[in-house]
Amino acid sequence: MINIGFFVEGQTERIFVEKLLSEYLTYPKYTIESVKLLGEKSAKITTKKNVSPEIKYNFLIYDVGCDEKVVSALLERADKMINQFKYYRLLALRDLHPEKRENKEKIINLVNNKFNEKSFKNHLGFILAIMEIESWFLADYNLFYRIDNILSPNYIKNKLNIDLIKDDPELYESPAAKVKKILSLVDIKYKKREKQSYNICHNIDYAFLCFSEEINNKISSFKYFVKCINESLNCF
């Protein structure tokens, strides 16, 4: 069995990764457990375990609760997870926001330098969503239509001058603000609450995001995230 760990900054990212994995792989070939870090302690949030002999992948997702702690939380646990519990890959996912766009390469290099100091550096990966994970949501331009059939791409363009089909969502300074504006058209307040995050993440077309070359070229950070997952899944 291949063990893969994810460290994410919050519940929206955690729910997105859970749903992405469940759409990307065939059940019952995997098991997923999500954990919320509470200081030095942790608490299980969701568990999708099974005892099928077909299980090939075991995923553990840590909801760190803060973008600044994603990498440090991974590094604090990496040695034990890799050497004792035999995790093949640990991936850290966080938003570039609130940092400025021009700091992107600086942050990536800083994290990779920290990883390179470790003997198990080849088992670590860092993904920076530009500017926020909501840019990945916006790339699925029919997402909002699935949430409410008033919210077609043309309707959104006419009302807000946001062209979901043509725009590069990674160029938005605040993708989350775009999501908030779009949902406000149907009187939905986007506050990243758990129920709301589930509703959004369960309406995303993950096959479209993963396998459309046009979309992959728009959201390069997501393309890299999927690449890291694929490398982990096919490690043996």
Located regions from the model:
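Extreme N-terminal starter segment of soluble prokaryotic enzymes
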Residues: M1-G5
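Catalytic nucleophile-elbow at a beta strand-turn-alpha helix junction centered on a G-D-S/GDSL motif
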Residues: F6-I15
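C-terminal accessory helical subdomains adjacent to catalytic cores in phosphodiester-
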Residues: R14-L60, E68-F236
